[in-house]
Design a protein with these regions (language model features):
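Flexible, glycine/charged-enriched surface loops at secondary-structure junctions
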Residues: 70-72, 186-197, 235-246, 288-292, ...
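Hydrophobic alpha-helical scaffolding
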Residues: 75-76, 89-90, 169, 218, ...
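Glycine-rich anion/phosphate-binding loop at the beta-strand->alpha-helix junction
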Residues: 214-367
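Acidic/polar, glycine-rich intrinsically disordered N-terminal extensions of enzymes
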Residues: 1-114, 148
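Small-residue-rich
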Residues: 93, 98-199, 206
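Internal helix-turn-beta structural module
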Residues: 349-427
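Conserved phosphate/anionic-ligand binding catalytic regions in large, soluble enzymes, centered on
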Residues: 91-127, 212-221, 300-324, 402-414
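A generic structural motif
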Residues: 122, 161-164, 210-216, 358
Length: 427
């Protein structure tokens, strides 16, 4: 396991090329050997190159399921490139990729016009987001800023009673420098920002928060936190129960992420002139503001939703897939609040604040060929200068894409064109 994804790294093998030539005879032999119990399906790369191993698994699955996996096996890069990302590979799932924009972004890290890449199977999504981008451009562009940054891991410790729990809390507060030194000894790039303790009976949760620069950083901070936990166990009477105690909180709906943030907290906003709302969105600022209040705020509150928005998960998921993010973290990425109000001049102010956008531009799926190209579209591939700036720029781009999507959908509801838009596009 590697502790770091280098925030300063940029992929050098830009030409991914196609898959390696498959040894069909060898693939057939391997599939037969698995069927006979002579070889294990997960260990075929020990006996052939990755593309031939994938072909052998396809033959095996086709024989047992009756499925035709010709499209699954038709992919455009060497299977070796995906070895850090998947086990038991048989091919790829191809999702249509499109772009919206270019949209004018006035960000702290991204200050330019950019096309936004979105990968989805939902028809009408890009048309809707693209309309929002067009309106944003007519309004002079959107402003976006990362307001908070820090990836978290929260181990849980067992203590005898609450008194011992409070003693651990005091120890953590008194030994922050030692915890920081232990955690940062495992990484060249991650920086421990703070540790927040939570006591529940005889359980103590320590929520470690790190600056992970341009990496999403879960691998990095898990290794760093393990080192810090060993220090806690060595110097206190607490016993580590689990390196993740679910107060992190990763890949689950959680109020702590919505309130405290996780990854990057980012806001994008725009003031749309009244005439643009009326002429391009075919509704009024008052109508959009009322819909947002009654739908996104009151309706979401009544539903007990953590997402006070219309469909932020749509552009977040589409840009996650396009750029090689961890798709399961859309759960946290959609923690967003949309606001809309009429200004004193009668124009429309709209904002989207995403509390927990867990993203990176190095490591993980960002190294895959098409995902790297999508990051190139945004100009944020690899490590930024200064470190962390590329991931900040990606966060701002996703926030503006989400803003465009919210603006367009709220307008469609205001003009009562939502169903007709789907009908006209045949979706």
């Amino acid at each position: 396991m590697t502790a770091d994804a280098d925030p300063d790294a940029t992929e050098t093998d830009d030409d991914a090329g196609g898959p390696a030539a498959v040894d069909d005879e060898r693939a057939a032999d391997l599939a037969a050997a698995v069927e006979a119990g002579e070889k294990r399906v997960h260990a075929l790369e020990d006996h052939a190159d990755p593309d031939t191993a994938a072909a052998a698994r396809r033959l095996l699955v086709e024989a047992q399921s009756g499925a035709d996996l010709a499209s699954t096996g038709s992919y455009g890069f060497p299977a070796e490139r995906a070895e850090p990302n998947i086990e038991n590979m048989i091919g790829t799932v191809q999702i249509p990729l499109g772009v919206v924009g270019p949209v004018d972004i006035n960000g702290g890290a991204l200050d330019d016009e950019r096309y936004l890449p979105l990968a989805t199977t939902e028809g009408a999504l890009l048309a809707s987001v693209n309309r929002g981008c067009s309106v944003i451009n007519r309004a002079g562009g959107a402003t976006a800023r990362v307001t908070k940054s820090g990836m978290t891991r929260a181990p849980v410790f067992r203590v005898d009673d609450v008194a011992e729990g409070l003693a651990l809390v005091e120890w953590v507060r008194d030994h922050g420098d030692k915890l920081k030194a232990a955690a940062e000894s495992t990484t060249n790039h991650g920086e421990l920002q703070d540790v927040t303790p939570y006591v529940v009976g005889n359980n103590v949760y320590l929520r470690f928060r790190y600056d992970t620069k341009d990496a999403m950083g879960m691998n990095m901070i898990t290794i760093a936190t393990k080192e810090a936990c060993e220090l806690v166990e060595a110097e206190t009477s607490a016993s580590l129960v689990a390196l993740s105690g679910n107060l992190c909180t990763d890949k689950k709906p959680a109020a702590i992420n919505a309130v405290e943030g996780r990854g990057r907290s980012v806001t994008a906003d725009v003031v749309v002139p009244q005439e643009v709302v009326e002429n391009k969105l075919h509704t009024t600022p008052d109508a959009i503001a009322e819909i947002n209040t009654r739908k996104n705020l009151i309706g979401s509150a009544k539903a007990g939703s953590f997402g006070f928005n219309a469909h932020v998960a749509n552009p977040v998921a589409a840009m996650f897939l396009a750029t090689g993010q961890d798709e399961a973290q859309v759960v946290e990425g959609a923690n967003a609040i949309t606001t809309a109000e009429v200004t004193d001049d009668g124009d429309l102010y709209v904002s989207v604040s995403l509390a927990s956008l867990e993203i990176g531009t190095v490591g993980g799926g960002t190294k895959l060929p098409t995902q790297s190209e999508a990051l190139d579209i945004l100009g944020v591939r690899g490590g930024g200068d200064p470190a962390g700036s590329n991931a900040d720029a990606l966060a701002e781009a996703i926030a503006v894409g989400s803003l465009a999507g919210e603006l367009s959908l709220l307008a469609a509801l205001g003009s009562r064109h939502l169903s007709s838009a789907h009908e006209s596009l045949g979706r």
